[in-house]
Each structure stands twice: as C-alpha cells, then as structure tokens.
Amino acid sequence: MATGDLKRSLRKLEQVLRSLNYPNEVDYVGLIKGDTAASLPIISYSLTSYSPYVAELLMESSIELIAKNDVRFTDTVYKLLRDQFDYKPILTKKQFIQSGFAEWKIEIVCDILNCVMKKHKELIGLDKNSSCQRKKNVSEKPEPCSNSEKRPAEAVGIDITGRFMTSGKKKAVVIRHLYTDEKVGVPEGTVTLADISQGCSESAEQSSDIRIPEAQDPEVKAELQDICDHPEITALQIALAECQEKLKQLTWIEKRLERLEAATHGKVMVDEKAWNNLLSRVTLLETEMLLSKKSESVERNVASQDCESISDVDFVPYDKNYSVGGAAGNYRSSGCSAVSSETAPGSSIVNYCVLREFSEETTIQKMERMKKMFEETAELLKCSSR
C-alpha cells in the first residue's frame, strides 16, 4: 500500500470529522496501523451522538449499540448499514476486526460518516415537511366563533359624523338618535349607544367582581400596612425567631453533653501529647534500669578479675624463687614472700573500696535522676487530670 494513498485517506477523514464536529481525539497511530479500536469510537459517535434524528431511527428499529464488545458492535453496525443505509462495506466483518487494511478501514469510516450525515439531512427534510403540513391543516380548519363573541374583540370607533366604525370590512352603520322605547324604526344589525353603555356597565361589574376577593381580607391588608409602617418591629420579630432557634440548639447541646458526661463518668481523660510523653519517659526509665543492672554486673566481674590477677601476681614469683634458688635464694624468697603476703591483701582491699565508692556514687546519681523523672511525670499527670 502506498503511503500517499494513506495520507490522502487520512486528510479525507479529517475533513469529514470537521464537518461532523467530532469532539474527541483521534488515534491516528492506530488508524495507520489498521487497529479496529481506533475507528470504532468514531463510528459510535456518528450513530449515537451526532444526530438526534438518527438516534430516534435506531430506537425505532430497536438497535442497541451501547455496552457491547467489538465483535458484536461491528456485527450490529454491518446490519444497520445493510438495512437502513443500503451500504455494503468493502471489507468483511472478520477483515474489519483483524489488524491491517488501514486504508480500506479509513475509507469505510468516511463512507459511514457520509451516510449518517446524508440520512440526517433526509430526516430533517421529512420533519420540516410534516410540520408544514400540520400548519396548513390547522389554518384550513374553520374557527367556531359566534357573532356575539366576535363583537367585543373588534376595535370599535365613532367617526366625527356620528358613524359607528369597526376594524373589519363591514360597512359603517349610522346611529339613529330618534327612536322610541320600543326601538321602533331601528334596523336589525345596528348598534346603539344604549348597547355600548350596557356593555361598559357589564365590564365594570365584572372588574368589581374580580376586585371583591381583595377586599374580603382586611386583616391581611392591615398586617401588610403594619409591616410597611413599622420595619423595626418586623426586624425584631425576625431576631426573636432566630434567638428561639438558637435556644433550641443550646438545649439540644446541653442534653448531649449530659449524655457524654454520664458515659465518661469515672474515666480519666489525658491529652495525647502528655500520654506519649509519659510513655517515652517510662521507657527511658526502664532502659536506664536495665543499663544500670548491666553496668553493676560488669563492674563486679571486673573487680573479681582484678582480685584474681593480684593474687596470681603475688604468688607466682614466690614459687619461682623457691624452686630455683638455694639457701640465699631461700632467704631472699622468704623475705619477698613476707612482703608480698603483707602488701597483697592491702592493695586488693584498696581497689575493692575504690570500686565500691565509685559504684555507690553512680547509683546515687542514677537514683536522683530517676526521682526527678518520677516527680516530673507526677506533675504531668496532675496537669492532665485538671
């Protein structure tokens, strides 16, 4: 397939879509690839949303195009084109659903759009003809109106010469002023001044009858007059009504508060931040206790190891001298042993006392810190309870 033919068909499709006022975006990449999903939205819009006349035609022929998959949609479209538009596409259903045949698919879409626009114009012409025929039928029907009903509708006027004129094509009628009470000499079809005055009096009576209901409600008129005369009173009444509504809301809120108090009776309410602070302090105390226990055990182990090392240092040289030397060596070794036996316990006691004093100082400091933290937590609890 030549690329020039494909471009030409795409330009043709763009022109048809402009004349159709297609609002959505067109998937040109899918159309070039021959993807069926790119052309189905255009066909669906043209048949369902473009023309209300075409949509009515589909409804009358009981054709549904909504909520269907691609295969069923193409099947119904092909049937619709065959039955309503007398159009047979170049491709079969299987070929149209398959990928490919890009140029032929674009041509089919253009043909469908042109068929829809042509059908739309035909239906508009039929609708116009039917409406014109109805208007003609209505105008041809005679209006059932009597002569007595026509007279009030006509414009009435009196000429300067005393002639009684009407707006129609009737001849002017001369009013004869010289007549008896029995209307002798008055021809038929003439209208006298007495008749005109009688009609005016009847219309005045009708207007008075219409105005009677307004006069039947003097209380309403009095209230309206009071409102117009005293706008401050109306404003006060409105404010009073608003205050009453607010009082009702307050009573409802008080009842709800009482229910909440009854539900939370005996429970301690603590702020979330204070509670989190308290939990963090408790965890710190627990960790410090564990660390202090571990440090004490480590110090004891170190002290025991120091004592053992001191005892080993004191007794090992004595054994060596005793095994190697003679009499003099024995004398010297005995002196050394005496010194070591006197000095070793003293040094071990001193080291143990120093370690004990150091450990006591650290424990006292830790206890003071813990005491301070406990006091702070107690104050926080008091503040939260208040």
UniProtKB/Swiss-Prot annotation:
Keywords: Coiled coil, Cytoplasm, Cytoskeleton. Residues 232-263, 359-383 form a coiled coil. One of its GO terms (molecular function) is microtubule binding. It is found in: Cytoplasm, Cytoskeleton, Microtubule organizing center, Centrosome; Cytoplasm, Cytoskeleton, Microtubule organizing center, Centrosome, Centriole; Cytoplasm, Cytoskeleton, Spindle pole; Midbody. Centriole-enriched microtubule-binding protein involved in centriole biogenesis. In collaboration with CEP295 and POC1B, is required for the centriole-to-centrosome conversion by ensuring the formation of bona fide centriole wall. Functions as a linker component that maintains centrosome cohesion. Associates with CROCC and regulates its stability and localization to the centrosome. Residues 11-194 are annotated as: Binds with microtubules and centrioles. Its main location: cytoplasm. GO terms for cellular component: centriole; centrosome; ciliary basal body; cytosol; midbody; spindle pole. It comes from Mus musculus (Mouse). It comes from the Eukaryota. Interacts with CROCC. Interacts with POC1B; the interaction is direct and recruits POC1B to centriolar microtubules. Binds to centriolar microtubules. GO terms for biological process: centriole replication; centriole-centriole cohesion; centrosome cycle. InterPro entries: CEP44, CEP44_CC. This is Centrosomal protein of 44 kDa.
